[in-house]
């Protein structure tokens, strides 16, 4: 049995252990707003758009969330995950990790979810790929200063968004036509969503899981990850950073 099978078995076992915890959670609201309809059989394709300098937790955090989702009635993973870059050249992320992209922007499968982490400034070709792909996505989400990449497409113009608290001033200066929400863990606008810095991407990914499969599945996913953050259920939970002294 390989490591992935071992993990799946452990997660299935933990679902049983989760039941007592779920009973304790029963008092919490279970309604899901802005729900999304998952495919009956096919996997949901999730593209992680990366380039040099991509911040690891910004894309690996959401990746872990999506890969840990288990639907008891399914044999396979409900999400199909892959990386996309402008070329197949290895990407050197923050901290030096190297990632060889699965696809380029010219041959990537059409995504239903796009994850845009903090990274280097995008080329015109990458900007165009985001704009074109977002016409048919369920969710195009940025994490941290990935909001700058998403804003560069013009898709956020006239909408509200958030980003890493240390970049509030720069974002407001660069994109005055975007309503910056300081103190938001994440912000949703139709098929667009932006998360605050770093770990905020985990919460936004859990929120996407909730929109597809409901709050109980999202809770089980967080439980299996031993993730105790509650921000995915409260988009305004970054108030600590709304007026943080380190903000610029």
Give the positions of each predicted feature:
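Bacterial N-terminal signal peptides that target proteins for export
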Residues: 2-14
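Short linear capping/connector segments at secondary-structure termini
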Residues: 184-189
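Class I SAM-dependent methyltransferase SAM-binding "motif I" and its flanking Rossmann-like core
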Residues: 163-165
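A short glycine-threonine-serine/GTX helix/turn-capping micro-motif
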Residues: 190-197
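Extended, subdomain-level signal for the structured scaffold at the beginning of enzyme domains
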Residues: 6, 20-140, 147-152, 157-158, ...
